[in-house]
């Protein structure tokens, strides 16, 4: 059996959102399943002494342009929340709690969090509470 594609993402990442809308289709076309793995990019950046792209002059402006361009190219609706970046610890915990017993339901949760609460709602909500 072919190993699954491991999809590492952070709910705070617009790139993660865009990838989440396409990863299952891409994997399926190649006979692979997807193992969704949310993680905290902020924690990884902290231990590696890195900054979020949007906080780096010039790079941050380009990242926003790049995200919007990919959104248009793939025809994936995207509204970056005004309170972005966001804390995603609760979202990750909820995903892994559900994934213990039902991976499909956990994926549905991840997609719902991305689509409804973060990037496609006219007024995206804060996930940190």
Language-model features, listed with the residues they occupy:
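Short active-site neighborhood of thiol/selenol oxidoreductases, capturing the structured segment around
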Residues: 4-9
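Single conserved hydrophobic/aromatic residue that forms the stacking wall/gate
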Residues: 119-129
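Structural alpha/beta surface segment adjacent to cysteine/selenocysteine redox centers
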Residues: 11, 17-117
């Amino acid at each position: 059996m072919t190993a699954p594609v491991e999809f590492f993402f952070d709910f705070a990442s617009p790139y993660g959102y865009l990838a989440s809308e396409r990863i299952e289709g891409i994997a399926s076309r190649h006979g692979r399943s997807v193992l969704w793995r949310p993680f905290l990019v902020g924690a990884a950046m902290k231990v590696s002494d890195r900054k979020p792209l949007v906080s780096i002059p010039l790079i941050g402006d380009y990242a926003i342009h790049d995200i919007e361009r990919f959104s248009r190219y793939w025809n994936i609706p995207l509204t970056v929340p005004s309170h972005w970046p966001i804390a995603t610890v609760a979202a990750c915990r909820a995903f892994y709690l559900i994934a213990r017993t039902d991976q499909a339901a956990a994926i549905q949760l991840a997609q719902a969090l991305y689509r409804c609460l973060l990037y496609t709602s006219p007024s995206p909500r804060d996930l940190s509470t």
